[in-house]
């Protein structure tokens, strides 16, 4: 019998890297609203009192970069100097250029179905039946903890909470099945006036206990709440933030491999993003169909080429049919060409700001989470 621990972390919308992701995706959404043919690669850097936006954007749209940036920061909750960052007074700088025409000639085609990939890349998708949303439990519950913190903060139930927060959950497994939660780490930015005793009790009673299933909490579960004892300075004042620096938080919490490409700020012609969504869609439908308990898929692409250069599936000895048979099913059922997967998942819509926090996967509001291929896989 094999026992092991597995840990995943998440961060809140007020974490500096997530501020950057949200700004990049807010700008992407506004561009897509106006121009479905836009090519967007938008990067954001945040530090005390400043936001720097760069990248390559080719579009007929006009967007107010400064207004969108300030509104995004304001919605997160950085509304005055007390929080360490002020949406109204921070500097907003833009160094946006246009996409290279060398890339454009490899991507755009007269026949949309022959649209080439926007870059080379390797992409992974994953699903497991250990939770109802077919996601790994550690990342699922890490997300739920910081999401709960945000809800309590925005409803002013815990008035001393500030936007920046982090969670980390360690699950204990036996023979591949969850048998308990070993360790919970939760750190939240707070007002200076709150005492640590009050903070720790409130976090335990209002955040941790309502979120984590009681069946997995034992007398041996360890809890570390604001373990440094103080978290007043947070957000961009505490650390600089960059788009695309939380790629494991965005995906499967480390339980699946990652190709290295970030998501936020990229339009769907970038397979780093769109093919990762398609790979999750494929893996989730395979698991939902009962063809495997766990499924990881790797896709690869070449710039300017429509068809994937490779498809690999691994089911970790849980597959009900061979991996080769699964690959054949995937090739026959799913259109994994760049234009095909954009159409399949209806990706040319302003849906990306909501993906930028609390994970891109395991959330039913997103089209790559639908289970409409299960019956076809079983035929």
Curated annotation (Swiss-Prot):
Keyword Transport (UniProt): no
Keywords per UniProt: ATP-binding, Cytoplasm, Magnesium, Metal-binding, Nucleotide-binding, One-carbon metabolism, Potassium, Transferase
Cofactor annotation comment: Binds 2 divalent ions per subunit. Binds 1 potassium ion per subunit.
Principal location: cytoplasm
Pathway the protein acts in: Amino-acid biosynthesis; S-adenosyl-L-methionine biosynthesis; S-adenosyl-L-methionine from L-methionine: step 1/1
Free-text function comment from the UniProt entry: Catalyzes the formation of S-adenosylmethionine (AdoMet) from methionine and ATP. The overall synthetic reaction is composed of two sequential steps, AdoMet formation and the subsequent tripolyphosphate hydrolysis which occurs prior to release of AdoMet from the enzyme.
Identification of the protein by name: S-adenosylmethionine synthase
Source organism of the structure: Buchnera aphidicola subsp. Schizaphis graminum (strain Sg)
Gene designation: metK
């Amino acid at each position: 019998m094999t026992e092991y621990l597995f840990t995943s972390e998440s961060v809140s919308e007020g974490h500096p890297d997530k501020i950057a992701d949200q700004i990049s995706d807010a700008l992407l959404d506004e561009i897509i609203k106006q121009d479905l043919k836009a090519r967007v690669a938008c990067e954001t850097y945040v530090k005390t009192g400043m936001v720097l936006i760069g990248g390559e954007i080719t579009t007929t749209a006009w967007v107010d970069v400064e207004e969108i940036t300030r509104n995004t920061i304001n919605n997160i909750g950085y509304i005055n100097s007390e929080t360490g960052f002020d949406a109204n007074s921070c500097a907003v700088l833009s160094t946006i250029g246009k996409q290279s025409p060398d890339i454009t000639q490899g991507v755009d085609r007269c026949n949309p179905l022959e649209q080439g990939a926007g870059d080379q890349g390797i992409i992974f998708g994953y699903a497991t039946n250990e939770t109802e949303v077919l996601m790994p439990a550690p990342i699922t519950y890490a997300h739920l903890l910081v999401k709960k913190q945000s809800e309590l903060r925005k409803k002013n139930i815990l008035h001393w909470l500030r936007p920046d927060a982090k969670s980390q959950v360690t699950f204990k497994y036996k023979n591949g099945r969850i048998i308990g939660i070993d360790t919970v780490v939760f750190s939240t930015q707070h007002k200076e006036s709150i005492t640590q005793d009050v903070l720790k009790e409130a976090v335990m009673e209002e955040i941790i206990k309502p979120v984590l299933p009681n069946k997995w909490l034992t007398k041996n579960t360890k809890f570390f709440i604001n373990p440094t004892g103080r978290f007043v300075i947070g957000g961009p004042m505490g650390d600089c933030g960059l788009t695309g620096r939380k790629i494991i938080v965005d995906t499967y919490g480390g339980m699946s491999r990652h190709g290295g490409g970030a998501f936020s700020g990229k339009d769907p012609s970038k397979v780093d993003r769109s093919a990762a969504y398609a790979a999750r869609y494929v893996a989730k439908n395979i698991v939902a169909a009962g063809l495997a308990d766990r499924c990881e898929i790797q896709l690869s692409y070449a710039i300017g080429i429509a068809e994937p250069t490779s498809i690999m599936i691994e089911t970790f000895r849980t597959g009900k049919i061979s991996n080769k048979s699964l690959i054949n099913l995937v090739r026959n059922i799913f259109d994994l060409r760049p234009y095909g997967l954009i159409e399949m998942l209806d990706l040319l819509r302003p849906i990306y700001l909501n993906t930028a926090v609390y994970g891109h996967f395991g959330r039913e509001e997103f089209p790559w989470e639908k289970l409409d291929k299960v019956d076809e896989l079983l035929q």
